[in-house]
Each structure stands twice: as C-alpha cells, then as structure tokens.
Amino acid sequence: MKKNKDMKKTLMLSASALCMALLLMSAKGDEGIMTKEKSTYVVNTTQLASDVRGFQGATPVKIYIKGNKIQSIEALSNDETPKHWAKVKKLLLEKWNGLTVDKALKTEVDVVTGATLSSKAVKENVKRGLEYYKKNK
C-alpha cells in the first residue's frame, strides 16, 4: 500500500515538473526574433512571418535598425526562383534604407515587375518586422 502511495507521489511530482518545464519553454516563444548588436536592433522575420509566402515559399528577412532608422534589410535563405529573387534583392530591399520605422511603415513600396509574389511577401515580412520592433524595442 505504501509503495502505491510513493509511486503516485513520484508520478504527480514528475507530471508537475514536466508541466512547469513546458510552461517556461512556451513563455519565450519569440526568442531570437529580435536581438541587439551594440546599438543596432536586428529583427529576423523567419518565425514572425512564417506564414507569408512568395512564389515558392517563405521569404524571411533580417531588418537592421539603428536610432529608429532602417540601416539595411538582408534577404535570408529561401526557395524563390534565383533569377526573380535577384531582382527583388537588387531593386526592392534597399527601398527602406534610411527611413525611420514610422515612415517605412507608411511608405508604399512598388513591387518588382516579374517578381510580384516574392515582392509582396518581402513587403509583408518588412511590415511585420517593423511592427514587432515598435512593440518590443
């Protein structure tokens, strides 16, 4: 009888510890989305906009922000068509450079001809990244 009580007690303690561990892990689900390197914030949209799709899939970016101004936007690994993605990188990503976060959120950037879906996806990634920055800086 005592053995059963001890076993139940051990099981309850183990279950409680597991629940606590899961709770703590889920509390920091946004870890890695925004980091700070010296005085520059870096927002990575890989998790933040994982549902945003270009022509072939997700189009995550890293947004570098210093003094509330966008320094640069870096394209991260994706499955977009290389020819079209090269156009997006060359013609679209630098459009936000030098803008304040608020101005960038209000600016309507044109899509790149021939890479419309990829362009729209990048624009949405940038929007979500900047909104996240504003809420969490």
What are these model-predicted stretches?
Residues 1-7:
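N-terminal secretory signal peptides that target proteins for export/translocation
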Residues 17-18:
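Repetitive helical segments and hydrophobic/amphipathic motifs
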Residues 8-14, 23-137:
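Flexible, solvent-exposed loop/hinge segments and secondary-structure transition points
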